[in-house]
């Protein structure tokens, strides 16, 4: 795969659906590409849920959706709590610290709160990359985030353009793409990914990978649906571990040079095959997610060590 033209959508879908191409063979192809660009290094990321449950959006996968009656709700946390998270991240060899807020988008006051905090964090931990995930932002807010030292902005496409309206109706696919493009225009590294397992087709999955290639996302988190009771997709079955591996491998082959991260839902979907995912992915979230728990940090560190890989610090 290294010495050929980039895959077309048609080729990628054929490979993804092929019953003749063994998943482990596909994973080996992806590993060749991953090793070429990233060696055996694994980037670590950590999330802080800085504002929870206060949201008017109706995303079908989300436990913080406006549709959810029972959910954890709190306003934007104090600056000291965000700074404490940065200290924990540094102590645990985390390379990127992600500050996440619920809601359609931040107020100017909330952006100022985040910016002041990031400026302080950067003085103490200049090597720690800061990723903000605040929703749909305005141009002037993006400029403030950049000036404060935010390195990366996460805004996931989540699904294909074709399937988008099955997932959420309170904002458009174009809203999401425009947010990613605005961050790029303001020299903030774009992080954008997907959630697989929401009832989308194989064609949708391949379309997601190509859409992320088209917007040139630097970092691509691949989430697998962890069904939450009461949400639109709460009754769906988990994906099989083997399908998850095929998805991760295809995202690597379609986006060979990008940081591919196994993210939310990896523990319950990949199960015992989690270590194999790092043959294609080169990045993971460590610790808990927004409202679902992750596995203990020690298990992730042991997994990396047992594979003969090393933390990219």
Swiss-Prot record:
Necessary cofactors: [4Fe-4S] cluster; [2Fe-2S] cluster
Details of cofactor binding: Binds 1 [4Fe-4S] cluster. The cluster is coordinated with 3 cysteines and an exchangeable S-adenosyl-L-methionine.
Gene Ontology molecular-function annotations: 2 iron, 2 sulfur cluster binding; 4 iron, 4 sulfur cluster binding; biotin synthase activity; iron ion binding
Binding-site list for [2Fe-2S] cluster: 98, 131, 191, 261
Keyword field: 2Fe-2S, 4Fe-4S, Biotin biosynthesis, Iron, Iron-sulfur, Metal-binding, S-adenosyl-L-methionine, Transferase
GO BP term, pick one: biotin biosynthetic process
Alphabetical list of SUPFAM superfamilies matching this protein: Radical SAM enzymes
Domain Radical SAM core span(s) in chain numbering: 37-263
Protein's pathway: Cofactor biosynthesis; biotin biosynthesis; biotin from 7,8-diaminononanoate: step 2/2
Lineage: superkingdom: Bacteria
Known EC number: 2.8.1.6
InterPro entries found in the cross-reference section: Aldolase_TIM (IPR013785), BATS_dom (IPR010722), Biotin_synth/BioAB (IPR002684), Biotin_synthase (IPR024177), Elp3/MiaA/NifB-like_rSAM (IPR006638), rSAM (IPR007197)
Entry binding sites for [4Fe-4S] cluster: 55, 59, 62
Reactions catalysed: (4R,5S)-dethiobiotin + (sulfur carrier)-SH + 2 reduced [2Fe-2S]-[ferredoxin] + 2 S-adenosyl-L-methionine = (sulfur carrier)-H + biotin + 2 5'-deoxyadenosine + 2 L-methionine + 2 oxidized [2Fe-2S]-[ferredoxin]
Family from the record: Belongs to the radical SAM superfamily. Biotin synthase family.
NCBIfam families given in the database record: bioB
Subunit structure, interactors included: Homodimer.
Annotated function: Catalyzes the conversion of dethiobiotin (DTB) to biotin by the insertion of a sulfur atom into dethiobiotin via a radical-based mechanism.
Name by which UniProt lists this protein: Biotin synthase
Species for this entry: Staphylococcus epidermidis (strain ATCC 12228 / FDA PCI 1200)
Recorded name of the encoding gene: bioB
């Amino acid at each position: 795969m290294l010495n050929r033209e980039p895959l077309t959508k048609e080729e990628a879908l054929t490979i993804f659906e092929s019953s003749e191409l063994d998943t482990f063979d596909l994973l080996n192809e992806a590993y060749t590409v991953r090793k070429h660009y990233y060696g055996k290094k694994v980037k670590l990321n950590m999330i802080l849920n800085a504002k929870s449950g206060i949201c008017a959006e109706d995303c079908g996968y989300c436990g913080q959706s406006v549709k959810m009656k029972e959910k954890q709700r709190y306003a934007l946390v104090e600056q000291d709590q965000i700074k404490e998270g940065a200290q924990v991240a540094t102590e645990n060899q985390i390379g990127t610290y992600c500050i996440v807020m619920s809601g359609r988008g931040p107020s100017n006051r909330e952006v100022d709160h985040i910016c002041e905090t990031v400026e302080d964090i950067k003085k103490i931990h200049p090597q720690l990359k800061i990723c903000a995930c605040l929703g749909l932002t305005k141009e002037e807010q993006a400029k403030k985030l950049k000036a404060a030292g935010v390195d990366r902005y996460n805004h996931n496409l989540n699904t294909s353009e074709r399937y988008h309206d099955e997932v959420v109706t309170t904002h458009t696919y174009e809203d999401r793409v425009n947010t990613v493009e605005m961050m790029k225009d303001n020299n903030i590294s774009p992080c954008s990914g997907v959630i697989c397992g929401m009832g989308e087709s194989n064609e949708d999955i391949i379309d997601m990978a190509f859409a992320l290639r088209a917007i040139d996302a630097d970092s691509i988190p691949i989430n697998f649906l962890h069904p939450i009771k009461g949400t639109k997709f709460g009754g769906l079955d988990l994906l099989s571990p083997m399908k998850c591996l095929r998805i991760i491998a295809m995202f690597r082959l379609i986006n060979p040079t990008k940081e591919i991260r196994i993210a939310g839902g990896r523990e319950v979907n990949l199960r015992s095959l989690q270590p194999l995912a790092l043959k294609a992915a080169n990045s993971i979230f460590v610790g808990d997610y927004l409202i679902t728990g992750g596995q203990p940090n020690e298990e992730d560190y042991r997994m990396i060590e047992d594979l003969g890989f090393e933390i990219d610090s």
